[in-house]
Amino acid sequence: MFIVQYRQNTEQSNYLCTQRTRRLLTTTNTMLHFDTDYMEGAHPKIMQRLMETNLEHTVGYGSDEYSESARAKIREACNAPDALVQFLVGGTQTNATVIDALLHRHEGVLAAETAHINVHESGAVEHSGHKVLTLPSYDGKVSADDVRKYIDDYYADETYEHMVAPGILYITQPTEYGTIYSLHELEVLSDICHSRNIPLYLDGARLGYALASDEADFTLADIARLCDVFYIGGTKVGAMFGEAVVARDPKTLPHFFPLVKQHGALMAKGRMQGVQFKTLFTDNLYVDIAKHAVRLAMKLREAFVSKGYKIAVNSPTNQQFVVLPNETLDRLKAHATFELWGIRGEHETTVRFVTSWATSEEDVDAFIGLL
């Protein structure tokens, strides 16, 4: 472990911190990891429960007692006692399955041009026969005015039956850029969709980090109340794998179970997801994991700002986007992993740093010492 303290009170302490960090990294050849939040296995409490239950014999496909208990805990947290809760294996499978289940054959899905389903899911939605209908992105978010205009303009066109109909609105919380929709923004989008008979679907791959943000003025119950369907991400928030789809009204997703299987998203060993989500929703672990990651992300952000680096997006969650001179980027790459956000620029590049349950205070301090 790196025992490095980051102090801003004197130039001397900063210098000593930096020199010791570089010496430690050089002698141990240890890399610091900030590339994403699902590169390690699983939170120790989840691993412990998986090991403790490993030799138990239970029924498959999520019909076991652990999955039922996890569903009950999720319904309670969502204040939605009658909700459908279905576990799926991963985020792309979840999005493709839910969107296919919600849409008629002639419909497409409205989403920001930067949306994960439009950019980083290899055409999974299109593979099911549905088009992604893109809207302008504002730091990852869609605007209520753009959503309203798109739907209204579609039906105002005399030839609308010859075009792909907007069948649902897809948003993410937090967005691809780590930004979050406020409660008011969610309420307005929900009203627009429901007044036009269009379901609102929220991708919650990193939902825990949105809930843990200091800027969050909404709860999980608010999400369940305002969205027709959403999912609680496990893969990126401490679980080894798995996502939990929630539909407040089960009639919104009729025949969902066989559709999950058709899309290759149903696990025979469903208990594995039940154990994980039951653990995540016991003693507030889900939010505690996210709070830890967000706190360290904010510490990273403050260090970048104090060193004079430009913050590309005002993200209050565990993803931070920073503009780095290319020479700085290349120097840091020798000691840490992170992702280029887009194409490398001629002189400077936007870089993404991500924290998780596995990120330690020492990791962050060591990286700060390199700046």
Each language-model region and where it sits:
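PLP-dependent aminotransferase-class I/II
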Residues: G129-G167, I171-P174, Y181-V188
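Conserved N-terminal alpha-helix of the aminotransferase class I/II PLP-enzyme fold
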Residues: H43-G91, E113-N118, A124
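Conserved C-terminal alpha-helix-loop-beta "cap" of PLP-dependent enzymes
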Residues: H104-H106, M298-L371
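Conserved PLP-anchoring active-site segment centered on the Schiff-base-forming lysine
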Residues: A101-V119, R148
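Active-site C-terminal subdomain of aminotransferase-like
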Residues: Y138, A165-P166, T172, I180, ...
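Catalytic PLP-binding core of fold-type I/II PLP enzymes
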Residues: Y181-S213
